[in-house]
Amino acid sequence: MGGMALTGNKAVVYKGKGTVAVEDIGYPELILRDGPGVPKANVNRKCEHGVILKVITTNICGSDQHMVRGRTTAPEGLVLGHEITGEVIETGRDVEFIKKGDIVSVPFNIACGRCVMCKTQKTHVCLNVNPDRPGSAYGYVDMGGWVGGQSEYVMVPYADFQLLVFPDKEQALEKILDLTMLSDIFPTGFHGAYTAGVQTGSTVYIAGAGPVGLAAAHSAQLLGASTVIVGDLNEDRLAQARSFGCETVNVQKHDRLGEQIEQILGEPTVDAAVDCVGFEASGHGNQGEAPAAVLNSIMDVTQVGGSLGIPGLYVTEDPGAKDADAKTGSLKIRFGLGWAKAHTFVTGQTPAMTYNRNLMKAILSGRAQIAKAVNATVISLDDAPKGYSDFDKGAAKKFVIDPHGTLK
């Protein structure tokens, strides 16, 4: 159906440091062709277990921005986008359960469903989709070369295992701005809060008021936190956090986070903390970029025996880092402090499939209001470069690309 009837496919393409463009990349096939970032072992990989989606929504993510800023080794020509929601318009011959017309959420982790990691729900480190290292994602550096989904159409492999089918198509379209967050940031934020041990009555500090930080804050509320404090240096993003009931601290105005927390809680520590910033962190006060700043500060303010959820991205190669150690992902972390306080650290990609079905139920029931929390803002595919620019400038928005004008 799709391959014969359609030929064009506009997509967001990385063109080098600071630049993305919307270009025609050709209609997808059920095969992974050679291209930017595709390892030799993945070239011409057949995907009869896959489907072609007509993309309904695809979101700009903070981890996309790391690449666009030139802070990774992403190759020019890489098609971006790993937050994908769409309608199935073509199925491979080995697809048994997914049907044409299904509206689905695509977990950003690509996972085969067959390896020992997938069978133990560690889909974020699948062993069979990326020849270079465990784990994979669409449109991302060193992640297997799978073509990104900031496009009109995209191929998704291992469809029966991976895709989350929405039970009612009409309801799904009504709630699409919430449901589009299931591909990444809602599970990622929830994973951060959940692995930090947030439960009924917890006090929580969230580092970062970008979309993932706001998703973690909303998730902490869903998990029963009594007080959620969000820290950032962007006043617009802090105002967005306050809009749904969070307390906030501007970390640029003070170099002692514990004192800021004490002004809110009456004590300088929290039960749980979540790092939603990652390696492009800024130091407290006016210290400028300091990659270990967030990790060190959350160790400082998390109570003895507490847990730290770390969904913020850290990399093994950072060509834009200011010192030689940081270029290889080596950070000056006060690990002795974490050891002395018996902290638990949970890092890595989020296994989105662990959480997305239950979070879908929370959205469909009205319990979760994730689009409101992250200020979901719809833009056209042609406006994606401006969306990247505005997001890079600190816009307090989660940009949702609508490639076909479905949401008008």
From Swiss-Prot:
It catalyses: formaldehyde + NAD(+) + H2O = formate + NADH + 2 H(+). The keyword Zinc applies. Optimum pH is 9.5. Binds 2 Zn(2+) ions per subunit. InterPro entries: ADH-like_C, ADH-like_N, ADH_Zn_CS, GroES-like_sf, HCHO_DH_non_GSH, NAD(P)-bd_dom_sf. Zn(2+) 2 binds at residues 112, 115, 118, 126. Pfam families: ADH_N, ADH_zinc_N. Optimum temperature is 40 degrees Celsius. Stable at 30 degrees Celsius for 1 hour, with slightly lower activity at 40 degrees Celsius, whereas almost no activity could be measured after 1-hour incubation at 50 degrees Celsius and above. Keywords: Metal-binding, NAD, Oxidoreductase, Zinc. It comes from the Bacteria. Its cofactor is Zn(2+). GO terms for molecular function: formaldehyde dehydrogenase (NAD+) activity; zinc ion binding. NAD(+) binds at residues 62-63, 66, 212, 232, 237, 277, 284, 311, 313, 348, 350. This is Glutathione-independent formaldehyde dehydrogenase. It comes from Bacillus subtilis (strain 168). The lineage of its organism: Bacteria, Bacillati, Bacillota, Bacilli, Bacillales. The gene is yycR.
